[in-house]
Amino acid sequence: MYNKINFQAERCFHIFYQMCTGHKPEINEMCMLSTDPYDYKYQSLGEITVKSIDDTEELDATDESFDILGFDQDEKNGIYKISASLMHAGNAKFREKPREEQAEPDGTEVRNKRLRQIL
């Protein structure tokens, strides 16, 4: 799955783009997401917009699908938070420690804090 998210030169998971529309501001606020998909590495690697896809309408359809499946609001929020966590995690950067086989965060402490707050 990570390979699909990270390395395909196409749109990855549509929910990422749907959540960046700002159509449901409560999702963006809860998940600490901007409405600019270019702020997220995974989205910016592929097509941002596709003529045949209206991400605003698709977000409504996704949310309604969760309702049809019987998810309550807490469960839906959990899905949105997990999806947002993947988006934020994609922006994490690491640098190798000199002469060691370890890595350390490379200026992403703010993003790490967001991940902890979301989850």
PLM features: residue spans?
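N-terminal switch/interaction subdomains of large nucleotide-dependent motors and GTPases
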Residues: 1-119
